[in-house]
Swiss-Prot record:
GO terms for molecular function: ATP binding; hydroxyethylthiazole kinase activity; magnesium ion binding. The gene is thiM1. It comes from Clostridium botulinum (strain Langeland / NCTC 10281 / Type F). GO terms for biological process: thiamine biosynthetic process; thiamine diphosphate biosynthetic process. Its EC number is 2.7.1.50. It is an enzyme of class 2 (transferase). ATP binds at residues 118, 164. This is Hydroxyethylthiazole kinase 1.
Length: 263
């Protein structure tokens, strides 16, 4: 897998990533995409999304602070993505607490398309119909059977599924990866998961093997976090160092430093 130039190909293309995301972390998602080498657009007006998706490289839908207006825009955007062959990444933030979000995901799967679902372990287990431990938008799950949950959900939606936690798990329904990089400090800043979803959209935009591209996105975030923590041990300075290290991350670094078990 070390010959997979996911980041290089992404930076050569400078993909336009259309984000319909939450109000808490919208700025973080835009900044990390810019640092990574992509071009973010935070467009969510119903009258604009269909046309804008048609010129985008990927669509990122984050359900964190889902309003009715965002819901209708997200569904329409997914229809445009299906019609224009634009990959879609879904982040089901808080779905165990708010069941309407599951209905939105199912609606998008029905009328649009889903290429990647990226959530924490609790969210992914919940969507897979398994017992999970969550508190609001946070997972309290220990990760047991997480890869199995990813595999089941990947088969259900015919997409890539990633579950994040102390270890991270990715599956396409047949193949999988387990990632053991990262730092606990990523849980001490708001929006690390949302930013990761944006990176997944960037790496999948122009890379055919989305299991590999999703694994590369997670490695990029986790290794940038590890390096950031080496220089910044407090949350405020860590957030800034994280963005800086995403800017400097490379394919060579993620595959050499990455602790990945391929399944």
């Amino acid at each position: 897998m070390k010959n997979k130039n996911v980041i290089q190909k992404m930076r050569e293309k400078i993909p336009l990533i259309h984000c319909i995301t939450n109000y808490v972390t919208i700025n973080d998602c835009a900044n990390i995409l810019l640092s990574f080498g992509a071009s973010p657009a935070m467009c969510e007006a119903y009258d604009e999304v269909y046309d804008f998706v048609s010129i985008s490289s990927a669509l990122y839908i984050n359900l964190g602070t889902l309003t009715k207006e965002q819901e209708t825009a997200a569904v329409l955007a997914s229809i445009s993505a299906k019609n224009h062959n634009v990959p879609v990444v879904i982040d089901p933030v808080g779905c165990p607490a708010i069941k309407r979000k599951v209905e939105v995901i199912n609606r998008i799967a029905e009328v649009g398309r889903i290429d990647i679902i990226k959530g924490n372990i609790g969210e992914i287990k919940f969507l897979a119909g398994m017992d999970s431990e969550t508190r609001g938008v946070d997972s309290l799950d220990n990760g047991e059977n997480a890869l199995n949950a990813c595999t089941q959900l990947a088969k259900k939606y015919n997409c890539i599924v990633a579950a994040t936690g102390q270890k991270d798990f990715v599956s396409d329904g047949k193949r999988g990866s387990v990632i053991k990089n990262g730092t606990e400090m990523l849980t001490k800043v708001t929006g690390a998961g949302c930013m990761l979803g944006a990176l997944c959209a960037a790496t999948c935009a122009n890379f055919e093997d989305k299991l590999v591209s999703t694994t590369a996105a997670i490695l990029s975030m986790n290794i940038a976090g590890e390096k950031a923590y080496e220089k910044a041990q407090l949350p405020g300075s860590f957030r800034i160092a994280l963005i800086d290290n995403i800017y400097m991350i490379s394919d060579e670094e993620i595959w050499e430093r990455g602790n990945v078990e391929w399944k």
